[in-house]
Amino acid sequence: MKIIHKGLVEYLPTFEAMKTFNAGRNADTEDELWVVEHPPVFTQGLAGKPEHLLIRDDIPVVQIDRGGQITYHGPGQLVVYTMIDFKRRKTSVRNIVSALENSIIATLAEYGIEAAADPKRPGIYVGERKIASLGLRIKNGSVYHGLALNVNMDLSPFTQINPCGYAGMEMTQIADFVQPCPAPDEVASKLTAHLETQLTPKADNNE
């Protein structure tokens, strides 16, 4: 699996690049993880309802093809796009989602943060506060989009939306629990290591 660090990049060109990558895949295309941050942007998923955008300002809203409702991306949030051929890996989308969840939880545990998935709501939570979001698109036996982990960012734009369609959802981030807060690059190193482990087919782990 190839890990590509793209730095701070605009959302829309990245979204187009994901679609292009997935459309051009063949049986030999190596899976990739794209590690990025984005300038401020709201992204509205396929199930998105306009009423979940509570306040319109100068932050752009981009309609995209992942599942789910509206969320926010901004600097200081670690985003990992998972370009994975799950058919070739002989796994399921549910297992991919579990791998993403487990990787986030394990990464946060390294910083002494106890987090968990919620079977009733997508994402990862510390208590009742959401610290990470997940959203995928399934096409041609592969997935793209991925996860977003709040590290050290301005959380106030989340008050302009119902995050992932949940009114009053409180958000949190690593900086609320760890000072000095680790840089996103450090968190990315830990998270991608866990992702590689979690996404490796179990048969390969036994070799």
Swiss-Prot record:
Described purpose of this protein according to its UniProt entry: Catalyzes the transfer of endogenously produced octanoic acid from octanoyl-acyl-carrier-protein onto the lipoyl domains of lipoate-dependent enzymes. Lipoyl-ACP can also act as a substrate although octanoyl-ACP is likely to be the physiological substrate.
UniProt-listed Enzyme Commission number(s): 2.3.1.181
PROSITE patterns per UniProt: BPL_LPL_CATALYTIC, LIPB
Subcellular location: Cytoplasm
Gene: lipB
Protein name: Octanoyltransferase
PANTHER family (UniProt xref): LIPOYLTRANSFERASE 2, MITOCHONDRIAL-RELATED, OCTANOYLTRANSFERASE
Coiled coil: none
